[in-house]
Regions:
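Catalytic cores of carbohydrate-active enzymes across secretory and cytosolic contexts
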Residues: 1-453
Length: 453
């Protein structure tokens, strides 16, 4: 079986001498290679600015040194840059916050249609390049590619298509007509697929309710399923981690860890404020406590995201100044895409803070639960998708404000040793039972079923 996979980006970077390398990326992109355990994969993605001028095709095994049971080839596609930039702006500033129940800007109708056309154009170009007569079906990932299934259906009417929504679907639908038009636009494209997969049951329900209440959208002939992404437990546990960094914390020192992209939904500023509120009550006789922030700069081409990075840096400085009486620097900011260093921190944390305003899943939570060696506690929020599976074994903040997070941290600190051990055990058991292999197998199974129909 051969499946054509289409995504916004591929995990490909390059060295200073332009040699292709495997680049650690967030979200669903980094787990897509798992599909190659069950089928041959031709993966088509858009060329990012940093990859312009580089080769257009790669063998994944050659650049990653990862071996899968089936072939995995990556193809990069260049599309019209002006349309891509316009679509990216709209996805970043309007669709992304809309899907995460955040405020959205006002738009005029003409502008809205221009953005829709830009997204349609990019989706059509990508889909046309991803078509191959030898493919048995197509798997599309990313809300930015919501219109790809429509083009695939036109060009390959008899091939099965699965669309995976890795973000949430909004839980409260805004009343303004622009927001409704955008959600109808997304849903119309997604409904061209045979199967639509979601991270949580709540997201599936909200999407289903939206379609039912907004004709002429209809679900006839479309299967909706929950298939949450997970982690490759064996690979995670077997990966070599750097020795440096393990000595930065003494055995009795307390580690608070927050790993995220620099994105408003990740609630990093509230996390810093919550720790600061807690640390104001630390005394010199207590073991030292550190909040290590591992931030991957995100969407830095946009002024708002540049501003957020500046705000975070400034907030760290101010908080450390407030806590200067402790005699050490309790908040440490690590900026960059250093997966190995972040993974090493996950083995050592006492408290992993993932209190996003909203999150499709948050794979860091699952990675942390598997890698941690100290019965560390995960402090999260109900709006993090992974909590649908793991919430019973985490501390959930009642509110996603700094005060709410600080209260949850206090609750976590007051847990008994036995409670921590049981929570850690149950987290590992749950993730091991429903690991990445099960997710990938479920994706491929749909194509095998539909192929027979």
């Amino acid at each position: 079986m051969r499946i054509g996979v289409l995504s916004r980006r591929a995990p490909i970077g390059h060295t200073s001498d332009l040699t292709a390398t495997l680049e650690h990326v967030g979200g669903l992109t980094r787990v897509l290679p798992a599909l190659a355990e069950f089928a041959n994969i031709d993966w088509t993605a858009l060329t990012t600015h940093s990859l312009l001028g580089l080769p257009k095709s790669y063998s994944f095994s050659e650049i990653s040194n990862q071996i899968h049971k089936h072939d995995l080839n990556v193809f990069l596609v260049e599309v019209e840059s002006e349309k891509l930039a316009m679509g990216d702006w709209f996805c970043t500033h309007y669709i992304w916050p809309l899907l995460h129940d955040l405020p959205v800007p006002e738009l005029i109708d003409e502008t809205l249609e221009q953005h829709f056309n830009a997204i349609r154009s990019t989706s059509r170009e990508l889909a046309a390049e991803g078509i191959d007569i030898n493919n048995d079906g197509y798997f599309v990932n990313d809300f930015q590619l919501s219109q790809v299934p429509t083009t695939l259906r036109e060009l390959e009417p008899n091939k099965p298509i699965t669309f995976f929504l890795h973000t949430p679907w909004p839980k409260s639908i805004p009343s303004n007509t622009d927001a409704i038009k955008v959600l109808e636009f997304l849903a119309t494209g997604m409904l061209s697929a045979d199967v639509i997969e979601f991270q949580t049951h709540n997201d599936l329900q909200e999407f289903e309710n939206f379609v039912i209440t907004h004709p002429p959208l209809e679900l006839e002939g479309v299967t909706l399923e929950v298939n949450p992404v997970s982690v490759d437990v064996q690979t995670l546990q077997a990966q070599p981690l750097p020795i440096e960094g393990t000595m930065t914390l003494l055995e009795d020192e307390i580690s608070y860890v927050h790993i995220a992209r620099s994105d408003p939904i990740k609630n990093t500023l509230a996390t810093i404020a919550a720790f600061t509120e807690l640390a104001m009550h630390f005394t010199g006789s207590m073991p030292r406590s550190y909040l290590d922030l591992y931030l991957v700069p995100s969407r830095q081409q946009w002024a708002e995201y540049q501003s957020l990075m500046s705000q975070i840096t400034e907030c760290v400085g101010k908080s450390n100044a407030q806590l200067s009486s402790l005699g050490y620097t309790p908040i440490r900011l690590h900026i960059g895409n250093d997966y190995q260093r972040a993974a090493q921190a996950l083995t050592r944390y006492d408290y992993l803070i993932a209190c996003s305003l909203a999150d499709g899943l948050n794979l860091v939570v699952k990675e942390g639960a598997i890698l941690n060696e100290r019965n560390g506690v995960i402090v999260s929020s109900k709006n993090v998708g992974a909590m649908a599976e793991l919430g019973d074994f985490c501390v959930i903040a009642a509110e996603i404000t700094s005060t709410g997070i600080a209260t949850a941290l206090l609750e976590a600190r007051n847990l008994s040793t036995e409670s921590r051990r049981k929570m850690s055990f149950e987290l590992k058991r749950q993730i091991q039972e429903f690991d990445l292999g099960l997710w990938a197998q479920s994706v491929v199974a749909h194509f095998k079923i539909l192929e027979k129909v």
